[in-house]
Amino acid sequence: MRELIRLVSSAGTGHFYTTDKNKRTTPDKIEIKKFDPVVRKHVIYKEGKIK
């Protein structure tokens, strides 16, 4: 089953992306390098829960 997740910026800007993932095939937490428009750089985004 696909579940909604929140990718939070590690730069500490508070910026986040929302996406979904298949919990059965990827049970561990996702870490992806994406663009943060606040600092205008590519930074690591870590998975967090949607509140």
UniProtKB/Swiss-Prot annotation:
GO terms for cellular component: cytosolic large ribosomal subunit. The keyword Ribosomal protein applies. GO terms for biological process: translation. The keyword Transmembrane helix does not apply. InterPro entries: Ribosomal_bL33, Ribosomal_bL33_CS, Ribosomal_bL33_sf, Ribosomal_zn-bd. One of its GO terms (molecular function) is structural constituent of ribosome. Gene3D superfamilies: Ribosomal protein L33. It holds the Pfam family Ribosomal_L33. PANTHER family: 54S RIBOSOMAL PROTEIN L39, MITOCHONDRIAL, LARGE RIBOSOMAL SUBUNIT PROTEIN BL33M. Belongs to the bacterial ribosomal protein bL33 family. This is Large ribosomal subunit protein bL33. The gene is rpmG.
